[in-house]
A protein has these predicted regions:
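Basic/polar phosphate-binding segments, predominantly the helix-turn-helix DNA-binding elements
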Residues: 205-215, 236-287, 304-329
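Double-stranded beta-helix
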Residues: 90-120, 131-145
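A short, N-terminal "cap"/entry segment at the start of jelly-roll beta-barrel domains
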Residues: 1-30, 142-172, 340-357
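Generic protein-terminus/edge-of-domain signal
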Residues: 1-69, 75, 84-111
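…primarily DNA-binding HTH/wHTH and HhH modules…
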Residues: 291, 298-302, 306, 311-358
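An amphipathic alpha-helical interaction segment
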Residues: 123-133, 139-145, 149-239
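Short helix-to-turn junction characteristic of helix-turn-helix DNA-binding domains
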Residues: 54, 241-244, 292-293
Length: 358
């Protein structure tokens, strides 16, 4: 079982380009607080992950207690768990809230701001999902920076206070990564047929590759869901749970399948994933249930059986315990929320204007 693919199938991240920006020195902007991003960019979403692609010039990004991060042309920066941060042409400038100088638009517009000096240009986008899968997102660092240097990819991961790990350099994949970044930037500037879908898929593809890099290169020595996937025994237990989530699993069953003792699996699972196997299973079943409630017309009894509950009553109790409301109420409220969204927020959220210069 490819657990990461299964999670991404259920969570369904969608990509979008928000705007292009042309900043001229001196300039300094303060990002919106993370808790306000969904309402500002993708109402109805539980997750919003902004990203920037620098296309010209340099800038400085300041985040939490981490040392300032230099951003250069060609860099991709992904703010997975980043706190509110500032972005400026040089250190020491007082930032202005970005919400004060730019309003979200249904079209890709070019935001121009600054004092008329040296130019810094970026493409700003985001990924969003109507379901938050905490074990995956909580295992990620605050920020990723991916850059090309002499035809080699350099990957950096940062927490709010330091680098997450030593940088990783990769020869493999550098060519396609560079081509994907170039295509996304070109498509933003000169949109062709299917522009909305092309930009969404490219954004998603780049983020998925970052997830794979995190799993391969940055999870060793750290705790979290991705580290659990890399562990031979916990990873096997996760594969079993995701392959058959409706099965009446016990820790003993999982330990036998993983080839370790019950005590060893329980201890290792809790250390890496942050919860017990049965707590994790209950949470994943709720992810599946919410997807069925949102996307299907199945009755509660059938959904209950599909996600592993012996009765509708047991499912109702579990859903209320995890989500806070009964499943029928959640389904009704979610349907009303989707119906009330603007048309451009019900699918990919990208369109174009005549002002595409950047």
């Amino acid at each position: 079982m490819d657990v990461l693919s299964e999670v991404l199938r259920v969570v369904r991240l969608s990509g979008a380009i928000h705007f292009c920006a042309e900043f001229t020195h001196p300039w300094a902007l303060l990002s919106s607080p993370p808790e306000r991003l969904a309402a500002r960019l993708a109402p109805g979403s539980e997750v919003v992950i902004p990203f920037h692609i620098a296309t010209e010039g340099t800038s400085w990004l300041s985040m939490g207690k981490a040392p300032p991060i230099l951003i250069e042309a060609g860099d991709l920066i992904v703010f997975v768990n980043a706190p509110q941060h500032s972005h400026a042409s040089e250190l020491g400038l007082t930032p202005v809230p970005v919400a004060d100088v730019f309003r979200p638009s249904e079209a890709i517009t070019t935001m121009r701001y600054g004092g008329g000096g040296k130019v810094f240009r970026i493409v700003c986008g985001y990924l969003h999902s109507d379901q938050r899968f905490g074990p995956l997102l909580d295992a990620m660092p605050a920020l990723f920076r991916v850059r090309m240097r002499d035809s080699v990819l350099q990957l950096d991961a940062f927490t709010n206070s330091e680098k997450h790990a030593e940088p990783v350099s990769l020869d493999q994949g550098a060519r396609w990564w560079s081509a994907a970044i170039d295509h996304l930037v070109t498509e933003t500037a000169k949109p062709g047929p299917g522009n909305r879908a092309v930009l969404a898929r490219l954004s998603e593809l780049l983020f998925m590759e970052i997830l794979r890099w995190q799993l391969t290169y940055f999870s060793a020595g750290h705790r979290g869901w991705l580290a659990g996937l890399n562990d031979p025994h916990v990873g096997r237990a996760l594969s079993l749970l995701h392959a058959a989530p409706a099965e009446p699993w016990t820790v003993e069953d999982l330990a036998e399948g993983a080839g370790v003792s019950r005590a060893t699996l329980a201890k290792r699972f809790l250390e890496l994933v942050g919860e017990t196997p049965m707590q994790y299973l209950a949470g994943w079943r709720m992810q599946l249930a919410r997807r069925e409630l949102r996307d299907s017309t199945l009755g509660l009894a059938e959904i209950s059986a599909r996600v592993g509950y012996a009765s509708e009553a047991a499912f109702n109790r579990a859903f209320r315990r995890h989500v806070g409301v009964p499943p029928a109420s959640w389904r009704q409220a979610n349907a009303a929320s989707i119906a009330s969204r603007p048309a451009n927020q019900k699918a990919a959220r990208i369109s174009t204007t005549s002002d595409q210069r950047h």
